Amino acid sequence: MELVDIWHFLLSAILIEARGDIKAAAEWVEKRIAALDGQEARKAWIFEKEYRLDNMDPIEKLELLIGFSVFRKISIPLFDAILEDCQMSWQDLFRQYIGKNVLNFFRQDFGYKAGSYRKHWHDGREDNVHLVEILAELNDDSDNFKEKLYAAMQVRYEIRGSAQ
């Protein structure tokens, strides 16, 4: 789930760069993801310095991503390499991103802002753990995936004694 949070921050930076133009931001991302097939997909560039991603371990890639962030730079090939290191696809990322978004709405609906929401549910595990389990059970191809996810979370949260 941490990569979802990182992706969220990258998307926010892309939107800021696009001055809030969602279509332009989406086109920027789509263009760069589509370009991931070639030889350049295994490289990241910053200030004319080339980094060969295939020669880096996951920690080095994360450190490079942090360095890019310091200079407000975004490298889709670098993020893609990190996804690969974590054995995640872009589809996995998309699915988890939607899940995290639904979880944030769920938290708000059940009192997060007021302080009554319990992040640790009946079994002492965090809501993120339950989210991962529910995501594994659901088909994300359905038209009402978000609604099914929310409903499944609500059942676990309420029936298992976590709601106040």
Residue ranges with predicted function:
Residues M1-Q164:
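Flexible "arm" and connector segments at domain edges
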